[in-house]
Amino acid sequence: MPILNVLISGPVQAQTTQQVAEMLANCTSQILHKKPELTSIAIRYIEPEHWIVGGQSLATQGKSSAYVEIKITDETNTRAEKAAYIQAVYEGLLKLMPNLHHESYIHVDDVRAGAYGYGGKTQEYRAHNP
């Protein structure tokens, strides 16, 4: 039941939104073993003039960038799975975004089961009340 928050540099593009969402959903399902029907992905766009890396805007550098944050229940994935996920997501972004800046971050956020949930129930509650 992960939720992903994604920032992409550039103008809003429905095709890019769909491609990035599909890539993230596939990586999340295949590598982190999360159920696609419980995966939510929110994608927002930021103009390159307003995204600063190393003191210069992406527009000035002629680069694109992305930031991907995924919240998952703590202790549900290994370090190796999370490392593989970060690698796969970065490689997926490289294929979809021209001139991707090296400093495009992917953050896997392990959230305590008692502090995270959906539908009004925590993951801890779900684990003990199937």
Segments predicted by a language model, with ranges:
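A domain-level signal for the structural core that forms small-molecule/cofactor-binding pockets
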Residues: 1-130
